[in-house]
Amino acid sequence: MKKTQTWIITCIYLQLLLFNPLVKTKGICENRVTDDVKDVTKLVANLPKDYKITLKYVPGMDVLPSHCWISEMVQHLSVSLTDLLEKFSNISEGLSNYSIIDKLVKIVDDLVECMEEHSSENVKKSYKSQESRLFTPEEFFRIFNRSIDAFKDLEMVVSKTSECVVSSTLSPEKDSRVSVTKPFMLPPVAASSLRNDSSSSNRKASNFTGDSNLQWAAMALPAFFSLVIGFAFGALYWKKKQPNLTRAVENIQINEEDNEISMLQEKEREFQEV
């Protein structure tokens, strides 16, 4: 019985080990994003609508995969948020804004550190010159939310050379996400702020279709092989134990027959004595 339990436990641990790729986190830096991003809504409401925030915008955010621009964009966001933080540091009535911005700076700095740890040398980038532009709070934090959303889906599986080239006809002014004039609506999760921009969402979905298919294939293959290996181990174990079980059953039957014969012989002797 103990050997049987040992084999069962071994098979369970083997299955868990082989299924490990399925339970890993999808975003490599997702754990760096805290619930403090929910305070962006409050911050945007507190800032004047005509207030301008300087930011170096990376062209191609809506036409290239996220791994092409996220590393550059998060560094520029860190610089802009740090500059914004300094402007509120000495204003007593702006302590609430200061606290929110300070938390956002820490999140972005953690993301910068995470990207440096997972940087890929195989990505060939060819960006146009990045010029500093002025954005309203609504526009700036829409870009911020887009970047945070990208981190939740980002997975560095760039094993082969990947070219990130922005078309020469694309300019920041033509980027619909920057120039959008729709009402600013931020839900508890920053990713939902992009739903009203249907054209950008469609482009994003088409860009990631190929990558998502590859990711599903990469997860499905280990799962399939783990099932095959698990069934193979189970079959081998059953085949190994089957002769022993057969012999055990035969021995039990023989013992029962011997006992019956013994009882009959004993009764026969008692009857003869009587």
UniProtKB/Swiss-Prot annotation:
Presence of keyword Cytoplasm: yes
InterPro entries per the UniProt record, alphabetical: 4_helix_cytokine-like_core, SCF
List of glycosylated residues: 90, 97, 145, 196, 207
Ranges annotated as spanning the membrane: 216-238
Matches recorded under SUPFAM superfamilies: 4-helical cytokines
GO molecular function: cytokine activity; growth factor activity; stem cell factor receptor binding
GO cellular component: cytoplasm; cytoskeleton; extracellular region; filopodium; lamellipodium; plasma membrane
Subcellular location: Cytoplasm; Cytoplasm, Cytoskeleton; Cell membrane; Cell projection, Lamellipodium
Top-level taxon in the UniProt lineage: Eukaryota
PTM comment: A soluble form is produced by proteolytic processing of the extracellular domain.
Cleaved signal peptide residues: 1-25
Extracellular membrane side: 26-215
BP terms from Gene Ontology: cell adhesion; positive regulation of cell population proliferation
Disulfide bridges in this chain: 29-114, 68-164
Pfam families: SCF
Record membrane topology: Single-pass type I membrane protein
Cytoplasmic face residues: 239-274
Record keywords: Cell adhesion, Cell membrane, Cell projection, Cytoplasm, Cytoskeleton, Disulfide bond, Glycoprotein, Growth factor, Membrane, Secreted, Signal, Transmembrane, Transmembrane helix
Record-linked Gene3D superfamilies: 1.20.1250.10
PANTHER family: KIT LIGAND
Function: Stimulates the proliferation of mast cells. Able to augment the proliferation of both myeloid and lymphoid hematopoietic progenitors in bone marrow culture. Also mediates cell-cell adhesion. Acts synergistically with other cytokines, probably interleukins.
Subunit structure: Homodimer, non-covalently linked.
Similarity comment: Belongs to the SCF family.
Protein name in the entry: Kit ligand
Organism: Equus caballus (Horse)
Gene expressing this chain: KITLG
